């Protein structure tokens, strides 16, 4: 096989260029970026985290991936712009910018930023794996600030002993949230006196005269360490004497927080301020939350309700009822909102789609506040794509899928608490460009003629670039396709690969296996034909590139586009994939079976991209054939191109971009056996009103078919019976009318008499053995003739002479011995009795004992008996043996008829 390539036309180069744009490495499921996942595949293990820092500090953003990418990039959007758009920070610009430094080390990239007003904003990490870009969640860089009230305010409270005092020091705006320090008579108080909220509330439970004094506070920014002394002051007086009774009420300037925001899992304290005399007690209730007060997570305090381990169901309205027995009681209504970071509950899912088709990708997320959903296509926001549309439900609509959409599509859900992301691989099958498409009609005449000549020749349409999936530490699985085309037929494929991470460029290695194309033409409804093959003998922890070489019917070849760089990682670094379980294998046709399987859990669908099916005849020990089943949601698949009536063994394997699962258990299935009977089997057919062509076969009703077949069989039986009967009669007629060897029979038979139904039968046989009995014999003959005339019997009979057997000892060897007179007389009497019995219809067995069986059958024939023609009754002479031949000239004097 020659691998030398000839001249390529401009359409072929254009086809190659378009194929490069749409070639994909593998299905890369992008899992949640804000938490490491146990699933396999390429993902962001550690995304950059948001940071608040003072001006001039150095901040380091760290991004770590599960596999080393080809290269890292960082994108940045400034918060100073009204509509920020992310831009890539190029390495060259980073070197020239002293505020930004990028360092990459295998699978970790670090971005060092000096906090300046121009560097504040959002940052993303982008890991490139060939043409695919996996983007991290957003990290914000914010400046540490703190500010508060500047108006001095003094509060004078007079409270009866035993009450609980709650004082808010003031309102501050701080990023991050500040810490508070309280002072009593300019002496710092223990931290336990401060409640754990950002409003700076001072708690003084069960005040006494010792609690009287002056109180102040200071707020401190935890990031910058900046302290802010609040101008508010509290003068508290607790008299020792009893005060008059009073209903519960708020102190002057005291406020109630009617809305409390807290994160899920935290502990929150709902305050119920108010004093009275005697000191009131608080009673809590909630009309929205059933059992919200009295459970193992709540605690009722004199000054509030404490709820631990917040859950979304704790959101609602809480009512505090302060009562000391004096009316009116004091009520506070507090709204608790449990906030939750966004979490994607329905990630997007996409498979191979054709260029120009309409596509909808869905993504659903939960969170409080309701998260906002946006999409990235290979790191670029979908709002800048002219073919995309974002409806209110958060899905992504691609009105016409383009080649630029191929790659990693990610859905991001975002609210004030953070972000979550999930992604899928979108594969785009480009529109096939045939030779001569898009070429103008103008130009020189010679060029036009050359182009017209080129258009008449069939082109070598190359296969697509292979998708690569890891199978083991030393093998990968390649998947590619060939679009339906009118080009030259492909005979077989070859796989080529080379290592790319070594310093010296290595040559392409070619596998020994010839991968057959199969049928030379696509099926009518098959737009794309998929192929699968494995490559073994690779080295782990190295990068490879792959390509497919197609050999055509003209014995020339053409290679596909090269795959992206694929890093073959050791299996120890990858988490195992779910193993599918084969449930059933059903007969589908004589050449196909249907596989049915399931996964241990439907949640495992997010970890895989599809399945590999392996099969071979159970009686064979050869290599397994392979088939690829795209889509993690698939639970059945049709395996075709099998042999009729053959038992096959099957096993399945799930796969993702970077790994494959263990094999499922083997299971056997059989294709349908060929039909050995011509009886039509009842099948379901759709109604077709079109006229069938000459090569189409009608499917008749089984009842009608059986009726016609039975009638035809009955007619054949009747005809056969008639033919057999006629043949039998004809055979009997031939036996009676056309007797063979007539001349010989005349010599051996003696005519008895003519026979006619209208004439009396005269049977007379006289055998005179000696002259002495001749006279007596004549008298017997006359009497016999008279009896024959009276009987008028029309029956026909044949009488054969009974041969006389003589003893050899009496006759001697030469047969010349003379018989005694007594023996002759006994013979005479025997014959006379026989003759008399034959004439009167008596027993004639002695005379007819040696009659030929065939002759007797002829006599009994109705055809012969009914004949009106005169017949001859002949009696066959019995031939004597050599021992009795002397009788003719001896004692036997005459035989008369």
Curated annotation (Swiss-Prot):
It is found in: Membrane. Heparin binds at residues 498, 504, 506, 545. Keywords: Disulfide bond, Glycoprotein, Heparin-binding, Immunoglobulin domain, Membrane, Proteoglycan, Repeat, Signal, Transmembrane, Transmembrane helix. Disulfide bonds join 63-125, 169-217, 272-320, 363-411. The keyword Transferase does not apply. Residues 462-571, 579-674 form the Fibronectin type-III domain. The first fibronectin type-III domain mediates a specific interaction with Hh protein, in vitro. The second fibronectin type-III domain is additionally required for in vivo signaling activity. Residues 1-26 form the signal peptide. It comes from the Eukaryota. GO terms for cellular component: axon; cell surface; cytoneme; membrane; plasma membrane. Homodimer. Heterotetramer; 2 iHog chains bind 2 hh chains when facilitated by heparin, heparin is required to promote high-affinity interactions between hh and iHog. It is a single-pass type I membrane protein. PANTHER family: BROTHER OF IHOG, ISOFORM G-RELATED (PTHR44170:SF33), PROTEIN SIDEKICK (PTHR44170). InterPro entries: FN3_dom (IPR003961), FN3_sf (IPR036116), Ig-like_dom (IPR007110), Ig-like_dom_sf (IPR036179), Ig-like_fold (IPR013783), Ig_sub (IPR003599), Ig_sub2 (IPR003598), Immunoglobulin_dom (IPR013151). Residues 666-682 have a biased composition (Polar residues). Residues 27-702 are extracellular. Mediates response to the active Hedgehog (Hh) protein signal in embryos, functioning upstream or at the level of patched (ptc). The gene is iHog. Glycans are attached at residues 96, 99, 296, 351, 393, 467, 530, 561, 695. This is Interference hedgehog. Residues 434-468, 666-694, 773-793, 819-849 are annotated as: Disordered.
């Amino acid at each position: 096989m020659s691998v030398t390539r000839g001249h390529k036309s401009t359409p072929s180069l254009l086809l190659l260029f378009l194929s490069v744009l749409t070639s994909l490495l593998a299905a890369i499921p992008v899992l949640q970026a804000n938490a490491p996942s146990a699933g396999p595949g390429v993902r962001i293990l550690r995304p950059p985290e948001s940071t608040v820092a003072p001006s001039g500090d150095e901040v380091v953003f760290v991004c770590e991936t599960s596999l080393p990418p080809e290269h890292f990039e960082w994108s940045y959007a400034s918060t100073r712009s009204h509509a920020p758009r992310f831009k890539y920070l190029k390495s060259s610009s980073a070197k020239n910018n002293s505020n930004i430094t990028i360092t990459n080390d295998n699978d970790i990239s670090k971005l060092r930023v000096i906090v300046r007003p121009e560097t504040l904003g959002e940052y993303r990490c982008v890991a490139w794996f060939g043409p695919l870009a996996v983007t991290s969640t957003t990290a914000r860089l914010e400046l540490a600030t703190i500010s508060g009230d500047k108006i001095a305010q003094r509060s004078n409270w007079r409270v009866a002993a035993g009450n609980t005092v709650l004082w808010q020091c003031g309102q501050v705006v701080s990023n991050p949230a500040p810490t508070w320090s309280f002072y009593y008579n300019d002496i710092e108080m223990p931290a336990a006196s401060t409640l754990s909220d950002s409003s700076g509330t001072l708690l003084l439970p069960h005040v006494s005269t010792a609690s009287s004094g002056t109180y102040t506070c200071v707020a401190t920014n935890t990031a910058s360490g900046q302290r802010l002394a609040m101008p508010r002051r509290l003068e508290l007086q607790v008299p020792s004497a009893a005060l008059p009774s009073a209903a519960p009420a708020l102190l002057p300037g005291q406020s109630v927080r009617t809305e409390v925001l807290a994160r899920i899992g935290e502990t929150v304290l709902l305050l119920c301020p108010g004093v009275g005399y005697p000191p009131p007690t608080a009673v809590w209730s909630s009309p929205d939350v059933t059992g919200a007060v009295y459970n193992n997570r709540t605690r009722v305090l004199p000054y509030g309700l404490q709820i631990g381990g917040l859950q979304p169901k704790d959101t609602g309205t809480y009512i505090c009822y302060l009562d000391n027995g004096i009316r009116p009681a004091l009520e506070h209504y507090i709204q608790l909102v449990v906030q939750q970071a966004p979490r994607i509950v329905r990630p997007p899912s996409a498979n191979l789609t054709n260029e120009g088709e309409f596509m909808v990708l869905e993504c659903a997320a939960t969170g409080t506040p309701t998260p906002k959903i946006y999409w990235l296509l290979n790191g670029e926001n979908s709002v800048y794509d002219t073919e995309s549309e974002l409806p209110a439900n958060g899905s992504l609509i691609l009105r016409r899928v383009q080649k630029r959409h191929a790659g990693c599509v990610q859905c991001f859900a975002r609210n004030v608490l953070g972000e979550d992301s999930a992604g899928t691989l979108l594969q785009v099958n480009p529109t096939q460009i045939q030779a001569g498409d898009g070429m103008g009609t103008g130009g020189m005449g010679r060029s036009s003629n050359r182009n017209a000549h080129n258009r008449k020749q069939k082109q070598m349409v190359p296969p697509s670039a292979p998708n690569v999936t890891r199978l083991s530490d030393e093998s990968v699985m390649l998947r590619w396709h060939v679009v339906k085309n009118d080009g030259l037929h492909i005979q077989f494929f070859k796989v080529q690969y080379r290592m790319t991470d070594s310093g010296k460029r290595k040559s392409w290695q070619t596998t020994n296996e010839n991968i057959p194309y199969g049928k030379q033409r696509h099926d009518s409804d098959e737009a794309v034909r998929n192929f699968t093959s494995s490559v073994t003998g690779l080295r782990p922890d190295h990068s490879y590139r792959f390509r497919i070489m197609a050999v055509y019917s003209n014995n020339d070849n053409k290679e596909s586009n090269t795959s992206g760089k694929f890093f073959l990682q050791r299996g120890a670094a990858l988490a195992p994939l779910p193993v599918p379980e084969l449930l059933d294998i059903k007969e589908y046709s004589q050449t196909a079976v249907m596989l049915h399987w399931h996964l241990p859990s439907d949640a495992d669908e997010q970890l895989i991209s599809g399945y590999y099916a392996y099969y071979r005849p159970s009686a064979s020990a050869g290599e397994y054939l392979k088939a690829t089943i795209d889509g993690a949601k698939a639970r059945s698949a049709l395996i075709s191109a099998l042999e009729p009536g053959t038992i096959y063994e099957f096993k399945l394997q799930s796969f993702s971009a970077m790994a494959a699962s263990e094999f499922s258990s083997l299971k056997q299935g059989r294709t349908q056996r060929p039909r050995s009977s011509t009886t039509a089997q009842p099948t379901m057919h759709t109604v077709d009103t079109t006229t069938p062509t000459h090569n189409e076969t009608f499917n008749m009703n089984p009842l009608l078919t059986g009726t016609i077949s039975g009638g035809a069989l009955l007619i054949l039986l009747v005809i056969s019976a008639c033919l057999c009967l006629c043949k039998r009669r004809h055979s009997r007629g031939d036996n009676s009318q056309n007797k063979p060897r007539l001349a010989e029979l005349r010599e051996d038979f003696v005519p008895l008499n003519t026979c006619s139904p209208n004439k009396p039968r005269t049977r007379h046989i006289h055998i005179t053995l000696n002259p002495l009995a001749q006279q007596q014999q004549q008298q017997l003959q006359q009497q016999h003739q008279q009896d024959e005339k009276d009987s008028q019997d029309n029956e026909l009979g044949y009488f054969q002479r009974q041969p006389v057997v003589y003893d050899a000892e009496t006759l001697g060897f030469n047969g010349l011995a003379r018989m005694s007179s007594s023996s002759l007389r006994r013979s005479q009497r025997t014959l006379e009795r026989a003759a008399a019995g034959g004439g009167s219809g008596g027993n004639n067995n002695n005379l007819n004992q040696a009659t030929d069986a065939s002759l007797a059958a002829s006599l009994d024939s109705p055809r012969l008996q009914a004949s009106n023609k005169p017949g001859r009754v002949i009696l066959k002479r019995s031939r004597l043996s050599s021992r009795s031949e002397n009788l003719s000239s001896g004692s036997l004097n005459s035989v008369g008829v």
